[in-house]
């Protein structure tokens, strides 16, 4: 099987999500692709049953690769790339989805920009809740990294702000810089993006989000998003990657090399900046607490004034009612006096 794009779908025992992912891929307006489903030690019969339910035009594009023993999320991608060698590839995990024009626009970009090692699109985070049957209910949406209008190595060195679902990669460049590091449990996509951007520019298709990164706020690792369920691993793998690159830089240097001194200086300034931010944050919260106390005191005083005003209004109403009663009594007496006077005058 040969096509322009290889779409690798990593999955493991999430049939409802895999069904949704295949529907997302089948909806693409660009259809010169093949799909490699990497079943990472999951129920293969279940995967085959889901594939069997696809329309023949889609089913004919699908290859299933089953790892008898789980290789883990990051290493599973290599199983898919080993099974297909097309010009471009995308990672469409079973829990994410695409806009119908994702492949159309990203393929067009790479065709028009041969120097680009890849391209990314604007991405939207979809927060959802998992039902008992494994299907999901959307809760809210949020556009990711709205202040970024492209991909740069400078920004990528700070953090990974481009999830795999939003990228299309040129295969020959990936082969040159090296694929995902399967020894990592998380962050292999960030590590790859660093090497990719160090080698080649990566384009960006702005505008309407064409990729949807689904998040589920659950600690169930089988259903959750790794950003939530493995947050601590993301932190430590990030540090591990940074340490590895720093060691590589220093490996050929004399122990007294100025490069280590420069790195330590940067780390010290970072430490000081973090302490200063913590101090400012603490001062801000202290000021906020003072404002809060002042507002509470003001509100208490206002409530007391309102209470007193209500009592005054009640008292005034009582007085007005009394005055009204007196007026009615006076009018009644005056009326009786007039009638009596008329009677007396009539007798005379």
Feature-to-residue mapping (PLM):
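Nucleotide-sugar donor-binding/catalytic module of glycosyltransferases
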Residues: 1-240
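Boundary detector for helix-to-coil junctions that initiate low-complexity/charged tails
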Residues: 242-348
